[in-house]
């Protein structure tokens, strides 16, 4: 570790000025954390962070097959409606079916991640979902997903909408 850190210390400014590495991240301590932070990497990044990133990218592009690959087979999805509790869907295939239908039956659907936070086996995602209605007028909702991970995959996705 010391050898790599020493080599990097001599070259960091050159790489940073050239745009080859991101701005320094916050170090979470230790030699490895310090080195990763100097590269702009979060030493706390792990399988759950990666799963969330892949899932949100897939959902944002409407690729429900890719989204399903980021869920456990027994994943639970609680939809935002109908009020007051939404509908509970059990299993990745059931969630996939709901989402595929939603994207297929909506004109110009767009799911956008506004913010995400992953800590341990939990994540919170603030999002917006927009569409065009039958008269051509735009519409949107904003909401939050509370996510739980198991073995680096989503095992629970509870969705809530501002209303």
Write out the residue ranges for each language-model feature.
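Secondary-structure boundary/capping motif
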Residues: 49, 54-58, 72, 92, ...
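Residue-level detector of alpha-helix boundaries and kinks
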Residues: 37-40, 52, 80-84, 132
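Conserved aromatic
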Residues: 7-8, 61, 89
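A solvent-exposed, acidic/Ser-Thr-rich amphipathic alpha-helical stretch
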Residues: 66-120
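Hydrophobic alpha-helical core bundles mediating ligand binding, dimerization, or RNAP-core interactions
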Residues: 52, 59, 71, 95, ...
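Short acidic-aromatic low-complexity motifs
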Residues: 40-74
């Amino acid at each position: 570790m010391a050898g790599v850190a020493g080599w990097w210390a001599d070259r960091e400014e050159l790489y940073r000025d050239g745009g080859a590495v991101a701005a320094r991240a916050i170090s979470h301590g230790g030699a490895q954390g310090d080195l990763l932070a100097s590269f702009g990497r979060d030493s706390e990044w792990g399988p759950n962070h990666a799963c969330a990133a892949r899932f949100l990218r897939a959902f944002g592009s409407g690729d429900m097959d890719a989204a399903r690959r980021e869920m456990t087979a027994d994943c639970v999805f609680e939809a935002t409606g109908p009020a007051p509790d939404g509908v509970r869907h059990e299993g990745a295939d059931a969630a996939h079916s709901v989402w595929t239908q939603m994207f297929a039956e909506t004109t110009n659907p767009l799911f956008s991640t506004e913010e995400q936070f992953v800590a341990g086996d939990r994540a919170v995602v603030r999002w917006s979902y927009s569409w065009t209605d039958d008269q051509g007028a735009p519409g949107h909702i904003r909401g939050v997903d509370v996510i739980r991970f198991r073995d680096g995959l989503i095992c629970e996705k509870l969705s809530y909408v501002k209303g």
